[in-house]
Every structure is written in structure tokens, then in C-alpha cells.
């Protein structure tokens, strides 16, 4: 159980760091840890003068491996959750959307991978 608790703490810390990083870049955090019956979205943010971003945060030993760690099944689950999130917020739907990954690695600045995959709904 300790490993799971430690992983949960690392995940929350990574999400907090990613949210701070986004705010410093001018993004507005709309939601954290959005849970739907389709899945969970780590962060939802509004890009400055841009789309709504659904962001998966990955804490890894190396930032490079994080973007590759979100497989097609997880992408589909996040896309379904994003669809449900936007369905209840039509004012956000008009902005467009994209799917991003933020990689968190020890002793390094976060790496923001924009528009990593596409989804239609």
C-alpha cells in the first residue's frame, strides 16, 4: 500500500507543478482531476487566446519518455472524458480543444508537449 500512496503523492505533486507552470505561461486552470464515468483528466486549462487544453501529466525519470507513455487506449479514454466535460460547458466548446502532455522529470523544468493527439466528437 505504501508504494501506491507514494505514487499518488508524486502524481499530485506533479499535477501541482504542471498547473503552476501553465499559469506562469498565461494559461487559466479551469479544473483539476476531472472525473467522469469515461475516465479522468488531470488538468483542464484555457490557453491564452486559444483552445481548451486537456492535459495529461506524466512524472517520469526522463521527460522524453513521458510523451510516449500515453497509449491509444488512454488517449481514447481521455478524449471520451473531454467530450463529456465539454458537453456540459457549451461556452467552452466554441474555443476549440486540444490534447497536451506535460512531462515532469527530476531536476528539470516541465516539458509541455502541445497537441499530441487528435480526437473528434
List the predicted regions and their residue ranges.
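Acidic-basic catalytic patches of nuclease active cores, encompassing PD-(D/E)XK
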Residues: 1-32
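Conserved catalytic cores of phosphodiester-cleaving nucleases, focusing on short active-site segments
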Residues: 22, 41-45, 49-66, 78
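Positively charged, solvent-exposed patches that mediate nucleic-acid binding
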Residues: 24, 47-49, 92-93, 121
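Short, solvent-exposed loop/turn elements at beta->coil junctions and helix N-caps
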Residues: 32-35, 100-102
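Short acidic/glycine-enriched loop/turn segments that link adjacent beta-strands
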Residues: 37-40, 107
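Protein kinase-like catalytic core scaffold
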Residues: 39, 51-53, 100, 111
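Mid-chain, well-packed structural core segment of small domains
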Residues: 63-93
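Domain-level recognition of nuclease-like catalytic cores that cleave nucleotide substrates
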Residues: 89-121
